[in-house]
Amino acid sequence: MSDNNLTPRIEQLAPELEKIISTSEPIEHLADGFGGAQGPAEGPLWWKEGGYLLFSDIHNNRRMKYQPGSGVSLSLEPTNRANGLTRDLQGRLVACEHDSRRVTRQEADGSITVVANSFQGRRLNRPNDVVVRSDGCIYFTDPWSSQAAPEQWDLQYSGVYRMTPDLGTLSLLADDFVLPNGLAFLLISDCGIPYAAERPCHGNYR
């Protein structure tokens, strides 16, 4: 957190959160110094096999790794200012890259596959966050970029998209957001209802 006067807390909006974490546990400060003026560290992703946490230090264009007992170390630099991170059903890393305006997947051999970089022939704005559903579909948010004037956007809206598991079909699910940001599925059933948070905070939508 950038403001030491703020008290961190977890706001539980649904009982299903208890399936993931205990909200009664105290919040522990692990590290700081990330993000800079452009925003905080984001995109946390727990890598179960290695027992470590990956996260995006967007402003510094790098991916960091937190290992319990060892602290924070550099995982990758540069990252095209990647933000949201997740894994697909095969365990491959999927990332939203700001600078390259695309969503990518890292293969087992380290090569990069482009999941999406355009819609109907127009470049994406600035992919922000990404999740994978139990059927393998990839969902991501694509808000407009504050670094470009509206007339310079290829897409004249901020969107929420779904890509099929074979990377063959990209569908626009919503285009009426101002700035769609975080994305998650509510763990109530296998139907997987996607929820998107909007910034500035106008609420959560599904």
Where would I find each of the regions flagged by the language model?
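Short consensus segments that form the blades of beta-propeller domains
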Residues: 149-153
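Conserved blade-register residue in beta-propeller folds
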Residues: 65, 105, 162, 204-206
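Active-site cofactor/substrate anionic-group-binding motifs, chiefly glycine-
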Residues: 56, 60-89, 96
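Short C-terminal beta-strands that terminate individual repeats in beta-propeller domains
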Residues: 74-76, 115, 173
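Sequence signature of WD/YWTD-type beta-propeller architectures
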Residues: 2-15, 65-66, 70-74, 80-81, ...
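Beta-strand-rich domains and repeat architectures in extracellular enzymes and scaffolds
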Residues: 2-16, 21-62
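Short loop/turn segments that connect beta-strands within beta-propeller blades
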Residues: 66-71, 107-111, 164-168
